[in-house]
C-alpha cells in the first residue's frame, strides 16, 4: 500500500501547476485512498522528502524534489534512452515527439524504461523540449551484471558492466563473494540514486577464461544453463520406432543422404540428396531433424524451448535452444545413425521452378557428414575427396549444377545477395582474440543456402495446399508461421539516396513501387563501383527486418511469395512449430484432438511475437560479444595504423571500418589537421582552412588510440596523408 500511496502523492503534486501546501496534498490523497488515515499520509510525505522525491520550499509548500523549473501539469508517457553523457531522451508514446532529460531529472530511470514525465517551462534547446521524469512505469530489465570490488575499509562496490547504469548497488547478501567476482544481480527496490539488489548468480572470476562472454550473455537475459528437470527429461529420450511410427513414416534409408556443415558442427539438422533425372529435371530431397517428435507440446522441454526461442552462436560457444542430448545426439543427423526426420522432396526443372513437391515424415541415415571446406576443395580441384564414394562425388557435381540453376532463378526474380563480409574471430586458449579473418562464403555454403530456401518455399506451398482441406472441419483460418520481409520504407530509401549520390551510385527514384528486382538492378548497374561493398552495407541497413508472422505478406529480400522457416528446428523454435503443425493437420491428424489443434492455433500469434523478441536478443548478444572481442583485439594494437573506409559522418565524428570489418570512431577532436564544420544537408565534414571534405566512402589511414572492451568502443585518429 505504501508504494501505491507514494505514487499517488507524487501524481497529485505533479498535476499541480504551483507548489502545494502539505494539508491540501494530504486531503487530495485521502480523497483518492479513503482507507488511509492522515497520520500515515504525513509520514509518507516526510519519507518522500528524505528521499528527495519531493521537496519542501521555504514557505512549506511541496514540489517534485529535483525540479529547478516550473513544469507543465500535463503528464505524458514514453520510453527513455540514455546517452554516454548520462542524459536522457524520451520518445512520447504514439508520437514521434522527443524530449530531452538532463541527468539530474532522470529520477532513477534507466535506459529503455517506460516513464511518466512532464515538460519543463524552459526554452527548448536544439529543437528539443526539456522534460523531467516523475515516475517509472516499468523497467526494461531488472537483472544486471557487475563486478564485485572490495574496498580497503572493508566495504564493497559493484562496478556494473552497463556504462549507462548509474545507481549505487547495495546487495542484500554478499556471502561467498570475493574481489573480482562477476555477478548477476536483481534490483529489488530503488531510489533516485541507490538500489537494493539480491545476488542471483556468481558468473565466475573476471580472470576466468570465458567469463567476459558469459557476462554479456547473462546481461542480455540469456540463461546458458538448463534447469536440471529439463536436462533429466531430455537425457531419457532415445531413438526408437514403435509400430505406429513405423507405419506412418516412410523409410528413405537406402538414399545416400549427406550433410554439409561447418567443420566441427554438432547440431546437424539438415541433410541433402540430389539426383539428376534428365537434362530437364533434378530431384532434390531435403531431410530435416524431426525435433517435434521428441519435444511434445505441454512439456517442460517445450516450455523451455519456447522461452529461449533460438540457439545463440558466439565466438567461443553455442548456447543451444535444447539440451545437448537432443541438439547434439538423438536429433542431430550424425553420420552413420538412423534418425527421425521430415523430408521435403522436390522436382525442379532447368529454369529453377519447383514442378512437384511432397513433404512427409521419414526415417533416414546420414551416409557422410561433410564439411564446407571438404566440398569446396573438391569443387575447386584442390582435393579428389578420396573419403567420399563415387556416388557421393557424382551427386555433389549434380548438386552444384542444380545450385546454379536455383541461384540464377532467384537472381532473375530479384533476389539480392548483399554478400556482406562476416568476421571470424580467432581466439587463443585463454580466450584472447589473436586474429580477425573474413568468413569465406563459397560454392558449398551458397549451394546449401539455396537448397534450404527451396525447401522453405516448397513446404509453405505444400502446407497451404493440404491444410485447406483439413481446416474446413474446424472452421479455422490457415494456421501457419511465415517468415516475412517487408519492402524498405520510403524514408529509409530516401536516406540511402543521399549516401548513394555522394558515392556516385546510380539508382532509380520510384520508391513507392519498389520491387525486389529494383534493388538487384541497382547493384547490376554499378557492379564495378569501387565502393560496392560499402554501398551493399548501407543498402542492407535501409532494408526492413525479417520477422515471424501468422499472416503471409511475402519475403521481399528473397523475392518469394511463400516462405517459412522449416529447416532448423534444433536451433529455432518457429521451425519446430511448423513441424508440429504439419503433424497435427496433415501427417497424423487422427492422433490429435480438435482441442489440441485449436490450442496451438490460438498460441501462434504469441509464438511469433516471442520468437521475434528472442531473435533480436540473440543477434544483439552475438554483436555485443563480437564488439567486445574487437575492442580487446584492437587494445593489443594501440598505436598501429590501418587502412579503412568512412562509413558514417556525423557532427561528433567519423566512423571508419577497417578491412577486417572492425569499426571505430574518429572524434572531431582527433581530426587534428584542421577545424571541421559538419554540413548536415549532405552529411559531410569540411575543413575550415584547407577545405578538405570528409564524406562516406573516403579511404583513410587511421591510428588506434584507444579501445575499451567493457564499453566496446574503439577510437581512431586520422593519420596525415
Curated annotation (Swiss-Prot):
Subcellular location as annotated? Cytoplasm
| Keyword RNA-binding in annotation | yes
Its BP terms in the Gene Ontology are: mRNA catabolic process
Q: What Gene Ontology cellular component terms go with this record?
A: cytosol
What Gene3D superfamilies does this protein's entry cite? Nucleic acid-binding proteins
What UniProt keywords are attached to this protein's entry? Answer: Cytoplasm, Exonuclease, Hydrolase, Nuclease, RNA-binding
Sequence ranges assigned to domain RNB in this UniProt record: 249-587
GO MF entry, a single one: exoribonuclease II activity
What SUPFAM superfamilies does the record point to?
A: Nucleic acid-binding proteins (SSF50249)
- Provide the catalytic activity annotation: Exonucleolytic cleavage in the 3'- to 5'-direction to yield nucleoside 5'-phosphates
Keyword Transmembrane among UniProt keywords? no
Q: Where is the S1 motif domain?
A: 639-719
Q: What is its EC number?
A: 3.1.13.1
Q: What does this protein do?
A: 3'-5' exoribonuclease that releases 5'-nucleoside monophosphates and is involved in maturation of structured RNAs.
Give the family, as the similarity comment puts it: Belongs to the RNR ribonuclease family. RNase R subfamily.
Q: What is this protein called?
A: Ribonuclease R
Provide the species name. Ureaplasma parvum serovar 3 (strain ATCC 700970)
Amino acid at each position: 500500500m505504501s508504494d501505491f500511496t507514494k505514487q499517488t502523492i507524487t501524481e497529485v503534486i505533479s498535476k499541480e501547476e504551483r507548489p502545494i501546501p502539505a494539508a491540501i496534498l494530504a486531503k487530495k490523497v485521502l480523497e483518492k485512498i479513503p482507507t488511509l488515515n492522515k497520520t500515515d499520509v504525513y509520514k509518507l510525505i516526510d519519507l518522500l522528502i528524505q528521499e528527495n522525491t519531493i521537496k519542501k520550499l521555504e514557505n512549506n509548500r511541496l514540489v517534485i524534489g529535483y525540479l529547478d523549473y516550473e513544469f507543465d501539469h500535463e503528464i505524458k508517457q514514453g520510453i527513455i534512452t540514455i546517452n554516454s553523457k548520462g542524459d536522457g531522451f524520451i520518445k512520447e508514446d504514439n508520437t514521434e515527439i522527443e524530449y530531452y532529460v538532463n541527468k539530474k531529472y532522470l529520477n532513477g530511470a534507466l535506459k529503455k524504461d517506460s516513464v511518466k514525465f512532464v515538460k519543463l517551462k524552459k526554452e527548448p534547446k536544439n529543437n528539443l523540449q526539456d522534460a523531467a521524469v516523475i515516475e517509472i512505469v516499468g523497467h526494461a530489465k531488472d537483472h544486471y551484471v557487475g563486478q564485485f570490488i572490495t574496498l580497503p575499509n572493508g566495504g564493497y562496490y559493484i562496478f556494473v558492466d552497463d556504462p549507462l547504469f548509474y545507481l549505487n548497488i547495495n546487495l542484500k547478501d554478499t556471502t561467498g563473494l570475493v574481489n573480482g567476482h562477476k555477478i548477476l544481480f536483481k534490483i529489488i527496490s530503488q531510489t533516485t540514486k541507490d538500489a537494493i539488489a539480491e545476488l542471483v548468480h556468481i558468473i565466475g572470476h573476471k580472470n576466468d577464461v570465458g567469463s567476459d562472454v558469459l557476462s554479456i550473455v547473462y546481461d542480455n537475459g540469456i540463461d546458458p544453463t538448463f534447469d536440471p528437470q529439463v536436462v533429466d527429461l531430455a537425457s531419457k529420450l532415445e531413438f526408437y520406432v514403435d509400430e505406429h511410427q513405423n507405419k506412418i513414416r516412410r523409410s528413405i534409408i537406402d538414399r545416400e543422404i549427406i550433410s554439409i556443415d561447418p567443420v566441427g558442427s554438432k547440431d546437424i539438422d539438415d541433410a541433402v540428396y540430389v539426383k539428376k533425372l534428365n537434362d530437364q529435371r533434378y530431384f532434390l530431397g531435403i531431410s530435416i531433424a524431426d525435433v517435434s517428435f521428441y519435444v511434445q507440446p505441454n512439456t517442460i522441454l517445450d516450455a523451455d524451448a519456447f522461452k529461449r526461442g533460438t540457439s545463440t552462436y558466439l565466438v567461443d560457444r553455442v548456447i543451444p535452444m535444447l539440451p545437448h542430448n537432443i541438439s547434439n545426439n538423438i536429433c542431430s543427423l550424425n553420420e552413420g545413425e538412423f534418425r527421425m526426420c521430415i523430408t521435403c522432396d522436390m522436382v525442379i526443372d532447368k529454369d529453377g521452378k519447383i514442378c512437384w513437391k511432397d513433404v512427409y515424415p521419414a526415417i533416414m541415415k546420414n551416409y557422410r557428414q561433410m564439411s564446407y571446406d571438404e566440398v569446396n576443395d573438391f569443387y575447386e580441384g584442390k582435393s579428389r575427396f578420396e573419403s567420399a564414394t563415387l556416388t557421393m562425388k557424382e551427386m555433389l557435381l549434380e548438386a552444384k549444377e542444380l545450385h546454379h540453376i536455383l541461384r540464377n532463378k532467384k537472381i532473375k526474380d530479384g533476389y539480392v545477395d548483399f554478400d556482406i563480409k562476416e568476421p571470424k574471430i580467432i581466439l587463443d586458449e585463454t580466450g584472447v582474440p589473436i586474429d580477425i579473418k573474413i568468413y569465406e562464403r563459397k560454392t558449398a555454403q551458397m549451394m546449401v543456402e539455396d537448397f534450404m530456401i527451396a525447401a522453405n518455399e516448397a513446404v509453405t506451398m505444400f502446407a497451404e495446399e493440404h491444410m485447406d482441406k483439413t481446416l474446413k472441419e474446424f472452421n479455422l483460418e490457415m494456421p501457419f508461421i511465415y517468415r516475412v520481409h517487408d519492402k524498405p520504407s520510403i524514408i529509409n530509401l530516401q536516406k540511402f539516396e543521399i549516401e548513394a549520390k555522394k558515392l556516385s551510385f546510380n539508382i532509380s527514384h520510384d520508391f513507392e513501387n519498389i520491387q525486389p528486382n529494383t534493388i538487384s538492378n541497382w547493384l547490376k548497374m554499378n557492379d564495378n563501383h569501387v565502393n560496392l561493398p560499402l554501398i551493399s552495407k548501407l543498402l542492407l541497413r535501409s532494408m526492413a527486418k525479417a520477422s515471424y508472422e501468422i499472416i503471409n505478406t511475402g519475403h521481399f529480400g528473397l523475392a518469394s511469395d511463400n516462405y517459412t522457416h522449416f529447416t532448423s528446428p534444433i536451433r529455432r523454435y518457429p521451425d519446430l512449430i511448423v513441424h508440429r503443425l504439419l503433424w497435427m493437420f496433415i501427417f497424423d491428424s487422427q492422433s490429435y484432438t480438435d482441442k489440441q489443434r485449436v490450442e496451438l492455433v490460438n498460441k501462434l500469434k504469441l509464438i511469433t511475437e516471442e520468437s521475434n523478441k528472442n531473435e533480436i536478443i540473440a543477434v544483439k548478444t552475438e554483436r555485443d560479444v563480437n564488439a567486445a572481442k574487437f575492442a580487446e583485439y584492437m587494445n593489443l594494437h594501440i598505436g598501429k595504423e590501418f587502412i579503412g573506409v568512412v562509413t558514417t559522418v556525423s557532427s561528433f565524428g567519423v566512423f571508419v571500418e577497417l578491412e577486417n570489418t572492425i569499426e571505430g570512431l574518429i572524434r572531431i577532436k582527433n581530426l587534428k589537421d584542421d577545424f571541421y564544420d559538419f554540413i548536415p544537408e549532405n552529411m559531410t565534414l569540411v575543413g575550415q582552412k584547407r577545405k578538405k571534405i570528409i564524406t562516406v566512402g573516403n579511404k583513410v589511414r587511421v591510428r588506434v588510440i584507444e579501445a575499451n572492451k567493457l564499453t566496446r568502443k574503439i577510437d581512431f585518429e586520422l593519420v596525415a596523408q
